[in-house]
């Protein structure tokens, strides 16, 4: 209606003349201002072909079933026209929070309201939903913040809340001491990348738990880092010191040798602080799920899909993946 009032040539198509109270109100308003309205003839959809831009409002965010029959025919036709398509709230055929395997509108732009929808981040859709613009429609933020979601979108606002300004008199001893257990022969680069990231994120001190060969790479790439020999049965001296490390990173390029597994278990037994587990650290957990019970509180796991399936089990779609992830998080 607003486009017509701005002198755009608009043709609106509707499926039913009666719907929800909101639909009825808008439909009556459209008739009142004499918007060009036409009921869709599913047996003759050719009139849509002459559109320059298509605004998609066939279905809303409440959709919870597969698209079939005449609606599927309509969606496939719209996609085949290769016109510029703008979807409102979500492309028709895509639910706000549930994966549906049927066809959906492939939009050039999505104008969604208040917040991005969960499905926008599903692997099945993320490459197909393009150019999302979030519009403020005046919803009550206080009510919205009390609602429980399935996750939290990490953006600059979240990061800004975690930022702690540093005093001018601060020194490295005030900024935490991290332990990194990563890298093995042929994969030392993984540990170096992790070490650089730790320093970049603000760690004051960093110690690598590593073998003799790896030390040379560390001293050349990160001379400010310290090293400690990987533990053997003859040398468990570091186990008593594990408690001093404020965070421990485990896994990238680590391998799964017997000695690595022994050190991994020792860290979980001794640490009082969170651990970040990635790569081979996750593979070790997958081999011995009893180790999940020993993960310190607020530990973080960072699996890719293959690693996740090894310890969580298989899933068919993103909905099942989220259910598995939440179940494991609550359990451990």
Where are these regions (language model features)?
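Small-residue (G/A/S/T)-rich helix-start motifs and N-terminal tracts that mark the onset
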Residues: 1-17, 49, 109, 120-275, ...
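Short gly/ser/thr-rich secondary-structure transition/capping motifs
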Residues: 35-42, 68, 91-96, 159-164, ...
């Amino acid at each position: 209606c607003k486009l017509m009032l701005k002198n755009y040539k608009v043709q609106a198509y509707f499926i039913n003349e009666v719907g929800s109270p909101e639909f009825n109100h808008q439909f009556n308003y459209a008739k009142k201002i004499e918007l060009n309205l036409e009921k869709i003839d599913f047996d003759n959809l050719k009139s849509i072909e002459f559109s320059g831009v298509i605004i998609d409002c066939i279905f809303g965010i409440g959709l919870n079933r597969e698209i079939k029959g005449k609606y599927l025919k309509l969606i496939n036709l719209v996609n085949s026209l290769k016109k510029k398509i703008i979807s409102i709230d979500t492309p028709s055929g895509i639910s706000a929070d549930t994966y549906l395997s049927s066809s959906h509108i492939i939009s050039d732009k999505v104008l969604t309201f208040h917040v991005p929808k969960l499905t926008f981040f599903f692997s099945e859709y993320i490459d197909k939903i393009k150019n999302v613009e979030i519009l403020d429609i005046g919803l009550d933020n206080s009510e919205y913040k009390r609602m429980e979601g399935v996750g939290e979108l990490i953006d600059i606002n979240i990061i800004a809340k975690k930022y702690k300004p540093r005093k001018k008199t601060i020194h490295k001893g005030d900024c935490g001491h991290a332990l990194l257990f990563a890298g093995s022969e042929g994969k030392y680069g993984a540990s170096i990348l992790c070490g650089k990231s730790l320093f970049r994120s603000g760690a004051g001190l960093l110690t690598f738990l590593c073998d003799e060969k790896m030390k040379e790479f560390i001293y050349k790439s990160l001379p400010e880092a310290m090293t400690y020999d990987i533990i053997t049965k003859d040398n468990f001296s570091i186990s008593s010191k594990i408690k001093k490390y404020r965070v421990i990173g485990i896994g990238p390029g680590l391998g799964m040798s017997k000695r690595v597994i022994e050190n991994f278990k020792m860290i979980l037994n001794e640490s009082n602080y969170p651990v970040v587990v990635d790569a081979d650290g996750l593979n070790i957990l997958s081999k011995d799920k009893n180790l999940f019970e020993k993960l310190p509180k607020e530990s973080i796991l960072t699996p890719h899909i293959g690693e996740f399936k090894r310890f969580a089990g298989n899933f068919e779609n993103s909905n099942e993946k989220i259910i598995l992830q939440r179940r494991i998080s609550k359990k451990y």
